[in-house]
Amino acid sequence: MTPWYLYLIRTADNALYTGITTDVARRYRQHQTGKGAKALRGKGELTLAFAAQVGDRSLALRIEYRIKQLTKRQKERLVTEQEAFESLLSSLQTPVLKND
C-alpha cells in the first residue's frame, strides 16, 4: 500500500494551501511550476510549510477536508506544534476492529 501525505504550502502573501499526495517532492515541484492546483497559480514564491505521512488515501482525504475547515490561526498551530497535528490525526483515525 502506498503511503499518503498531507502537506501545507505557504504562498507569498502568507496564505496556507492544504493538499494530499503520495509524493510530496513531486507535488511541490508541480505547484512551483504552475502545473499543480489552480489556487496556487500566480501566488508568488511558494514554500513547503508542513508535510506528514498520514496513512491511506481515505484517511488523507478526511484529514485534508478537516484542515480546510480550520481557521488560519488553527492551521498555523498545526505547522508550529507537532502535538496539535497529532491530536487532529488521532481524532480522525478509525479504530481497527478485530474479528475473534
Curated annotation (Swiss-Prot):
PANTHER family: UPF0213 PROTEIN YHBQ. This is UPF0213 protein YhbQ. SUPFAM superfamilies: GIY-YIG endonuclease. It comes from Salmonella arizonae (strain ATCC BAA-731 / CDC346-86 / RSK2980). Residues 2-77 form the GIY-YIG domain. Belongs to the UPF0213 family. Pfam families: GIY-YIG. The gene is yhbQ.
